[in-house]
């Protein structure tokens, strides 16, 4: 690893995926579902294509709400390594709080568990281009061309882009310095709606040095 990359948060993950491709990365609690670093990197690559198809750009916000599992991890890491800003929403928040956070953060995409979507309507979150299920990735609601962002369309683009398969050598993520924003975290406030706290990449990098 080059000196300038030594403490870069995104480079941490880029190098970790490359160097630990066959090792176990995450397991869904209470199941036998375990993803290797290679499996996780592949899911991230497909999510990056989905972001592209949705027109997501650097510093756009992507919200994620649901219990911690491998899909939640995939969205979080895919967002940060794409160069976008992740907005994690506590799964215990009520629908009104989630709506406020999505709107206040100006998120463009929302990944949410099916149970957390109950009580939310697309017209309540007007800046959102598409909502995807964290359970199985199906589009719950969208304003975009469904043929461009269906899972089958994403797989077709993925297979065309990586005709020989996705390998460790293919892992290349966004170039972002640690002083740029990684996430906006909304805490459960004691009065009124929750407030957002900006977390730079350096704040996350400091936890894994």
Labelled PLM ranges:
Residues 22, 149-186, 193:
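Conserved pre-ATP/AMP-binding loop-to-beta segment of ANL
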Residues 54, 81, 85-158:
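Structural core segment of the AMP-binding/adenylate-forming
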Residues 60, 84, 179-180:
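Surface-exposed loop/turn positions
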């Amino acid at each position: 690893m080059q000196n300038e990359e030594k403490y870069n948060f995104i480079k941490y993950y880029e190098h970790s995926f490359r160097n630990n491709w066959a090792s176990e990365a995450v397991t869904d609690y209470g199941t036998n579902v375990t993803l290797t670093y290679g499996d996780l990197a592949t899911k991230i690559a497909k999510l990056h294509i989905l972001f592209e198809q949705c027109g997501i750009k650097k510093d756009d916000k992507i919200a994620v709400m649901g219990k911690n599992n491998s899909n939640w991890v995939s969205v979080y890491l895919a967002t940060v390594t794409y160069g976008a800003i992740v907005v994690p929403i506590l799964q215990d928040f009520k629908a009104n709080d989630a709506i406020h956070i999505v709107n206040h953060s100006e998120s463009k995409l929302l990944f949410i568990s099916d149970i957390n979507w109950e009580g939310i309507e697309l017209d309540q979150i007007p800046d959102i281009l598409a909502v995807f299920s964290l359970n199985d990735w199906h589009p719950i609601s969208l304003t975009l061309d469904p043929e461009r962002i269906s899972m089958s369309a994403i797989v077709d683009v993925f297979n065309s882009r990586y005709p020989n398969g996705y390998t460790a050598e293919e892992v290349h993520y966004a170039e972002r310095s640690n002083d740029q924003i990684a996430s906006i975290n909304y805490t459960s406030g004691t009065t009124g709606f929750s407030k957002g706290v900006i977390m730079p990449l350096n704040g996350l990098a400091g936890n894994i040095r």
